[in-house]
Amino acid sequence: MKQKHSRIGLISSVFIHIVLFASFISLVEVSHSDLSDGDSPLSIELVAALLEQPQVAVAPEEVTSTEPETFDEEPEPEPDAIPEPITKPIEKPKEKPKEKPKKPEKPKEKLKKEKPKEKAKQIEALEKGPEAKQGIVAQAVPGALQGKKEQVGISNGNPNGNSASSSDTGLVNGVLGGNGNGASSNEINAYKAALQRALQHRANNAYPAREKMMRKTGVVTLGFTISPSGKLIDVTVLNSSGNQNLDAAAVQAAEATKVAPPPIGFPPNVTVPIKFSIQ
């Protein structure tokens, strides 16, 4: 606003000066012309009056530099830099190490030292009084000979008959009636059946733990000789079961078995099958 008023004042003062200057010049010219014609006192007075007018002192305008107003523009906020997505390298899944198949642990074979169990009790013949004359020999194998067989054994007895007096006779005591002419076929068959049961019982107790756990079965046919004392010697495998451990267990069971002395006429060489089965 101040600049606008100053401009108006400047223009008006210039205009007034121009008017005054023009009027002054015109008066001077008129006065010169009048003087030339004869100066009149009126023109002189007018000129003097004009000259006597006080000149209006016009103050020089202050030149104000009109600098354009500068508005401090707020800097536009820079857009937030969008962070570039960090691409992680795709990790390949680590291959799991292949587990080695575990070998089946071999169970430790515990050697069970078992005392020979007697399935049947041996009754020693007492050589006293009239019983000694009859040569009564008790039958230690249950069910081996019953009924008439026992009567035959008693009737065949004599003072010279063999009696099972040893405690090492084991699981077999045939009806060893004191018959000097030899044992009957029934006695031999009963002795052989009792021998086979004794071997089977011993083999069941000697069943290898590993084969039992793996449910290995088989039949081993053994051949051996019975000594006069009832010990099994020269044990061999005539027919293998297909498993060496079962064969070895059968041989060990036979060698550890001791029975009563065989009856007279019993063949020394015997063949017995041993069956390993899981019940």
From Swiss-Prot:
Keyword Transmembrane helix appears in the UniProt entry: yes
TM spans (from-to): 8-27
Coiled-coil intervals, chain numbering: none
GO molecular function: energy transducer activity
UniProt keyword Zinc present: no
Cross-referenced Gene3D superfamilies: 3.30.1150.10
A Pfam family it matches: TonB_N
Subcellular location: Cell inner membrane
Name of the protein in its database record: Protein TonB
Gene assigned in the entry: tonB
